[in-house]
Structure formats: structure tokens, C-alpha cells
Amino acid sequence: MSAAADRLNLTSGHLNAGRKRSSSSVSLKAAEKPFKVTVIGSGNWGTTIAKVVAENCKGYPEVFAPIVQMWVFEEEINGEKLTEIINTRHQNVKYLPGITLPDNLVANPDLIDSVKDVDIIVFNIPHQFLPRICSQLKGHVDSHVRAISCLKGFEVGAKGVQLLSSYITEELGIQCGALSGANIATEVAQEHWSETTVAYHIPKDFRGEGKDVDHKVLKALFHRPYFHVSVIEDVAGISICGALKNVVALGCGFVEGLGWGNNASAAIQRVGLGEIIRFGQMFFPESREETYYQESAGVADLITTCAGGRNVKVARLMATSGKDAWECEKELLNGQSAQGLITCKEVHEWLETCGSVEDFPLFEAVYQIVYNNYPMKNLPDMIEELDLHED
């Protein structure tokens, strides 16, 4: 064997060391009582995930109840209720137009009714609405219920910075994991192949296979031929990357709008990845560094998001038009959110409280540009401050 082949095998061994992935096939024990699933949220990504879940609930009748409820914040589209459009035409014409939804996916405008007798809740709403949703759900969700958060962001309050999955667990008393990955919603909805990561820690009160949600059940719930799922336990790792990638993407949008090209975008992503990992090490030491490199929820998601997601588009328009972030968001996103705008403020507030702002110059630069109109052209100097501090 050549020296080059030896090096390749050695590198492969390092990359895969300690990596535990579930296989693409799912071997399941029939549930004693099929799990009833509800998706809370009906935006672009919420509807896409609801489509995936409904397809799998129909495909595994021995494991899941066939009907999937999707809570919809009711709107009127040309005089028709959005829920009625979804339930009769099987399309979300506002947030996911052109995509046919499964007939077992039922839009429900009543939040409390949508979670009646539920076993699994998938949260997929803009994260700023989570406290209000949890407040409404309190007292209506049994402790046996399990949840997955597809939200991107943090909850920052008197208790410090919290993962949104932890916030859900604390507020509702239910075990909650997370789903995150290199997933542009429209591409997933169009059934173009992609990967994602689901993270879930089996709780101490696990009731047993066939009676409770485990990694096999979650694999069956989310895995599709076009949507490949890796199930791991590092909820913190995938949640951190899922939140902070949007802040990095704003930085990429700024330099793109300034016309600085691919080299500048790559520099932002390099610095951003370092700050994401540093944030995890400092504030969530239970997160695993390999998650950032090896999972779809890590560097792959960062690359995809920085290639042209909502945050890049908003930041690019800010740079080219001189408009503020909120004008650009309203103009571009059809009522949806660029989550990085909120996350960068939450991160700034937390870092300021901890006295750690100087350790995260890119995150701070993005915050100052969005909220205090710092000149975008100063980004390189602001980022280089980290090296000065380390010297």
C-alpha cells in the first residue's frame, strides 16, 4: 500500500473515531399504542418537517397514529383561511407553495386541541414565540410526552443562556431533544437528497421499547429516502451550531453585499466556526467538539446557511441598500424571520453579562452592525481584535 493510501486510511480513522451513527434502515418494535404526533408551526420549515413526519406516520402504522396535527397560526389568504386551504387543497400556499402535502396532515388553528392526547410534539416556530407557546401549553401536556425542537436560538434570562430544548423541558416538564442540519426547507420539501441530525438523550424515566420514544422511534419519524437522519445524544452541540450559524451568516451577507467575494466569506466562516466551538466549550461543556465537524448540524449546516439562506439575504440587502435589518427582513421574507437578528442580540447580552464580549469579536461585530449601525467595512479590523487579545 502506498504512503498516500496509508495517510488516507489514517485520516479516515481519525474522522470516524468514536463516531456512532444509526444505520439508514430502521428495525422497530410495534408500539403498544401508536404514538400520536403533533407539529407546532406551519412556516416554511415547519410545514416541510410536518410533510416528512406525516409521510412516515403513514408508513409506520404499527408505530405512529396515522393522523398528524399541524398547529397553524390562522391567517387569511385572499379571503380564505389558511387552515382550510391546507386541509382542502393540501398545500401551504403562503409558506410552502407548489408542494403537495400528505392527506393525513391536518392543519389545526387551535393550539390546545392540536396537542390533545399527543405523545410526540415537534416544535418548529420562530424562537421568539416559544415563551408564549409554552405558557399556553402549560397544564395541557402530560409528563409522558416527548418533544423535538427544530428551533434555532437561545433563551436568555435571569437563569443565563439556555438551550431552547432545555427551556421546553423546564417549562412543560417533558423530555426534549433537537433536530438541526444542512437543510434548506424548500429543497427538502422538493425531496432533493439531504442529511440532518437529531439529538435526543434517553431520560431516566424511559418506559421501555415499544412504550416510549427512543432513537429508533425518532429515526423512523424523520428519516426519508431523500432526508437521511443521524441520531446522536449531543443535544447541546447541535443546538449551539443551529443557533449561532445564523449570526455567522449575517457576517457573510455583509461582505457579500460589499462585493468582497468568496475569500472574505470563507474568512467569516472560519472565524465563525471557531467562535461557535468556543461558545460551546465556555458555556455548554457537555457539548462534544466532534459534533461540529462530523454532523450535518455542524460545519455542513454552517456552509449551507452562509451560502444564501434568509440571514445572508437580509444582510446582503442591508449592505447594498443602506436599509436597516427590519426593513430588509420585511421586504424579503414574506412574514418569516431572519433568526440571526434576534440571536446576535441575545448572545451579546449574555456575553456582556459574563464579561466575555472580547472573546467573540465576530458575534459582537454583527451585533454592533445590526443594532448600532457600525460600518460594515470595519469587519476585518473588528475580527482581528481576537488575535491581539491572545498575544
Curated annotation (Swiss-Prot):
Matches recorded under InterPro entries = 6-PGluconate_DH-like_C_sf, 6PGD_dom2, G3P_DH_NAD-dep, G3P_DH_NAD-dep_C, G3P_DH_NAD-dep_euk, G3P_DH_NAD-dep_N, NAD(P)-bd_dom_sf
Give the induction text. Answer: By osmotic stress and by methylglyoxal in a HOG pathway-dependent manner.
Which reaction is recorded as catalysed by this protein?
A: sn-glycerol 3-phosphate + NAD(+) = dihydroxyacetone phosphate + NADH + H(+)
List residues, modification Phosphoserine.
24, 27
Q: List the keywords (alphabetical).
A: Acetylation, Cytoplasm, NAD, Oxidoreductase, Peroxisome, Phosphoprotein, Stress response
Tell me which residues this entry annotates as catalytic: 245 (proton acceptor)
BP GO annotations: carbohydrate metabolic process; glycerol-3-phosphate catabolic process; glycerol-3-phosphate metabolic process; intracellular accumulation of glycerol; protein import into peroxisome matrix
Task: Provide the residue positions that the database annotates as binding substrate.
Answer: 152, 310-311
The UniProt-reported impact of residue 143 to A is: In strain: WFB
EC number(s) per UniProt?
A: 1.1.1.8
Is Glycoprotein among the key words of this record?
no
The leader peptide range reads none
Spell out which residues are annotated as carrying N-acetylserine.
2
Known function? Catalyzes the production and accumulation of glycerol during hyperosmotic stress conditions. Glycerol acts as an osmoregulator that prevents loss of water and turgor of the cells.
Q: What protein name does the entry list?
A: Glycerol-3-phosphate dehydrogenase [NAD(+)] 1
The encoding gene: GPD1
